[in-house]
């Protein structure tokens, strides 16, 4: 494998990771339906250390707007409830019956849906900027190789890098459009 192929391969892997991170980020924005992905980044203060909710409890959604959080350790119930209640952008009704935490999401108003669309667009733009930064770093690496390998090879590598960047930016746009449609669906 040539040095140019290594640079392109590394950029491709980093862009793929950025795309996956963007999709996960989109999943954390509520569309009015209970989805375990909404609670992916919730950290619970479990005996003094921040612990991901998924490690402390099972998550099920028996109804479209209801999520049941079943702690593995009943002693963590209060802390789990507190972590969910203090989540930013979560205007859910949270109830604790001593065994489980029931999270009921309210119907989203049109204004709230539009607000969430703006948030998702911001996350999409951040992902595109990250992909372009990866392209810029890879291009700098290719430019540094101009003395070692032929200019034609570097130009081919840059062309391949541009196509890779365009593809990944388009994939972010597709995921963004799907999430926007999901958010605006009543």
Curated annotation (Swiss-Prot):
Biological process (GO), any one: translational termination
MF terms (GO), sorted A to Z: ribosomal large subunit binding
Any one Gene Ontology cellular component term annotated for this protein: cytoplasm
Subcellular location: Cytoplasm
Domain of life where this protein originates: Bacteria
Transmembrane regions listed in the UniProt entry: none
Coiled coil location: none
Pfam family, one: RRF
Keywords of this entry: Cytoplasm, Protein biosynthesis
Family statement: Belongs to the RRF family.
Function: Responsible for the release of ribosomes from messenger RNA at the termination of protein biosynthesis. May increase the efficiency of translation by recycling ribosomes from one round of translation to another.
Name this protein carries in UniProt: Ribosome-recycling factor
Gene that encodes the chain: frr
């Amino acid at each position: 494998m040539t040095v140019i192929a290594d640079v392109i391969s590394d950029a491709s892997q980093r862009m793929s990771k950025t795309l996956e991170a963007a999709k996960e980020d989109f999943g954390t924005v509520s569309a009015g339906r209970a989805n375990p992905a909404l609670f992916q980044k919730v950290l619970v203060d479990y005996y003094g250390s921040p612990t991901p909710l998924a490690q402390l409890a099972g998550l099920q959604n028996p109804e479209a707007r209801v999520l049941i959080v079943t702690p593995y350790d009943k002693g963590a119930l209060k802390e789990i409830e507190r972590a969910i209640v203090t989540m930013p952008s979560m205007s859910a009704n949270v109830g604790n019956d001593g065994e489980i935490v029931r999270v009921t999401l309210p119907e989203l108003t049109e204004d709230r849906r539009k607000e969430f669309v703006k948030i998702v667009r911001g996350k999409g733009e951040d992902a595109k900027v990250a992909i372009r930064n990866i392209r810029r770093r890879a291009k700098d690496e290719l430019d540094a190789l101009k003395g070692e390998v032929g200019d034609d090879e570097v130009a081919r590598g840059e062309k391949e890098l541009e196509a890779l960047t365009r593809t990944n930016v388009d994939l972010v746009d597709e995921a963004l459009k799907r999430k926007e449609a999901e958010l605006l669906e009543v």
